[in-house]
Amino acid sequence: MKGRKYTMKTGFNWKRKLLSLLLLFCLLTGLAGSGTMAHAYNVPDNMKWWADDKFGMFIHFGSYSYFGHGEWAMQTEGISKETYQKTISAKFDPEKFDAQEIVSYAKKAGMKYLVFTAKHHEGLAMWDTKVASFTDTTGQKIYSLQQYTPFGKTNRDIIMELKNACQQAGIHFGLYYSIIDWNHSSQTVEGDFTKLASWEARTAYIADMKAQLKELVDTYDPEIMWFDGDWTYKKDNPTLKKWWTKQDGQDLYQYMKSLKSDIIVNERVCRSFGLGDFECPEQSIPEKALSRPWETCQTMNNAWGYKKDCEKSYYNVRYMIQDLVEVASKDGNYLLNIGPKGDGTMTAGSRKILKGIGNWMNRYGDSIYGTSGTPFAKKPSWGRYTRKDNVIYAHVMKWPKDQKLVTKKYAGKKVKKVYLLQNGKKLKYNATGKKVIIKMPEKKPDKADTVIAVQYQ
């Protein structure tokens, strides 16, 4: 299993770094004001709900779930289009998929939004697409859940089921869409890249891709469109020319905004160019808050789509909670993935983790929702900070042996009270100089993270 990562390459220029330093200076000197949010970046109006929600569910689910070797199996195991269609997609029948149950678990875990894979790299559309070029290799059948698999006989629409369940639960709904399509006649997977049939095929494919995206927006009205599969370049192989460019990414972003002006779109319309509305580091956390909105997407067991071999490799609940807090302390969002099995049922491991996080969020959710990142430049040795209005939340992961927690004093403000967030019990403290020294209970209430609220006047 891969360990937690706290570094990443951002590709930002010096102007963005300067902006980050200026915003941090405002936080440290109290210029942001005690009654307003002070993010490390500007939050557009259409993204305020997203920035406040902080925590979402990612769902990787497709024909690869039936195979149980992960969503990249077609590529990693060298399976041809025809073989994949006949031996995997044609047998995919998720009759036990229960949108209400999945959304219920998301809500109880404290998740505020959800993103579902409408189409992953293997190309099977999880909705009843009408775009004619997306077929199997015979050209006779539309390659979709409804028209190609045994599940089609049910006349069910699992994306709409999820959409409706989210709406009932008050959870925001989003969709994932892969730019590359290993099944489409215009493309063939070759190693980690995708070979293009011709430049004429490229033009036709992009038009058809946009037609599918219009179907998704018109039918399901997603609030987020989460793109992926924007890599198509291999320098040492001229047959794998870079057929998806920055200009294509800009055009795709504008197209999505033309379909729905307030839709939130991630950077992977074409990554590394600062496009889209937010950055999305994958299974990694940046060392510092970024200069624009960002979201870490994370697996529970190092697998996105259902992978049998990873079912005994789940992280523990404590790890996942501390990951969430690490992200929130840096002003980011946390998109945590589940990969249902081929029949549509949730795995036991994902249920356990979601329940565990939910138990913690029931006590400490106020220290996550609607918060901004730490107002202090230095990380404490005992945990992390988040902030909301005039309250600094100390996330204590390492309990002080002498029962004295030393926290930084916020911007010369006067402390009003200090209390345990889980029950409101007041704690004794001594505010002196640049420190607030808090008398802690003898025993740590929560092993993963106990939150102490320091309220300022």
Residue spans of the language-model regions?
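Low-complexity intrinsically disordered segments
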Residues: 4-7, 33
